[in-house]
Amino acid sequence: MAGLLKESMRIKMYMEGTVNGHYFKCEGEGDGNPFTGTQSMRIHVTEGAPLPFAFDILAPCCEYGSRTFVHHTAEIPDFFKQSFPEGFTWERTTTYEDGGILTAHQDTSLEGNCLIYKVKVLGTNFPADGPVMKNKSGGWEPCTEVVYPENGVLCGRNVMALKVGDRRLICHLYTSYRSKKAVRALTMPGFHFTDIRLQMPRKKKDEYFELYEASVARYSDLPEKAN
């Protein structure tokens, strides 16, 4: 429940996985305000550094995976905050237009004033001469996730654009969010949108990265036609 969450919450993240067969581990620490929808994270690669691929493909598993820090307007039930103290999980498949695929599973739990994230990722089929494996990407454009409930699961569908020089590499994201609480204990939100701006203000030698995200959940601003 939202009462367990404070205006300032800490974050700890533990990530491991492979991308095109390269094994790595990352650890992150950060903080944010769950009620204003802003968060920051500082991430170190603890194994497998320097990464031989663009960290940009992992960034959405960190911040865009940190769904407690989404500002929900008053009329939208907050699925994620309702899920505490038990927490929630999500699974995501990201398909890039050049054939690369990234799958991820994340577990979110709460320990005192700290949110704990455990993330496992698997990246396959990224072209050796593509921008991901050549580390030629330059961050993400802002995007909007379409969110809706289905059989007790919150589904997210998104199209993201990775900046590559003067062009964009497009990818499609399919996410399933599952509360650890029984569905009957939740008030599920209706169809809505989540606007996301994910940035990387700083990185160092492909082994240290700083991320910032702002996100807000909203209904459509467009009025319905009167009868």
Curated annotation (Swiss-Prot):
Effect of residue 122 to H: Produces a dimeric form
Result of changing residue 173 to H: In Hcred; matures at 37 degrees Celsius and produces over 6-fold brighter fluorescence and a homodimeric form
Cross-link 2-iminomethyl-5-imidazolinone (Glu-Gly) placement: 63-65
Biotech applications: Fluorescent proteins have become a useful and ubiquitous tool for making chimeric proteins, where they function as a fluorescent protein tag. Typically they tolerate N- and C-terminal fusion to a broad variety of proteins. They have been expressed in most known cell types and are used as a noninvasive fluorescent marker in living cells and organisms. They enable a wide range of applications where they have functioned as a cell lineage tracer, reporter of gene expression, or as a measure of protein-protein interactions.
Keyword vocabulary terms for this entry: Chromophore, Luminescence, Photoprotein
BP GO terms, sorted: bioluminescence
SUPFAM superfamilies listed in its UniProt record: GFP-like
Phenotypic consequence of residue 36 to A: In Hcred; matures at 37 degrees Celsius and produces over 6-fold brighter fluorescence and a homodimeric form
InterPro entries (alphabetical): GFP, GFP-related
Positions carrying 2,3-didehydrotyrosine: 64
Listed Pfam families: GFP
Consequence of changing residue 2 to S: In Hcred; matures at 37 degrees Celsius and produces over 6-fold brighter fluorescence and a homodimeric form
Modification after translation (UniProt): Contains a chromophore consisting of modified amino acid residues. The chromophore is formed by autocatalytic backbone condensation between Xaa-N and Gly-(N+2), oxidation of Tyr-(N+1) to didehydrotyrosine, and formation of a double bond to the alpha-amino nitrogen of residue Xaa-N. Maturation of the chromophore requires nothing other than molecular oxygen. The precise stereochemistry of the tyrosine has not been determined.
Purpose of the protein: Non-fluorescent pigment protein that is lilac in color.
Family per record: Belongs to the GFP family.
Subunit (UniProt): Homotetramer.
Note: In the wild-type form, the chromophore matures at 20 degrees Celsius. Mutants have been selected to mature at 37 degrees Celsius to make them suitable for use in vivo and cell culture. A synonymy between H.magnifica and R.crispa is controversial.
Protein name: GFP-like non-fluorescent chromoprotein
Species annotation: Radianthus crispa
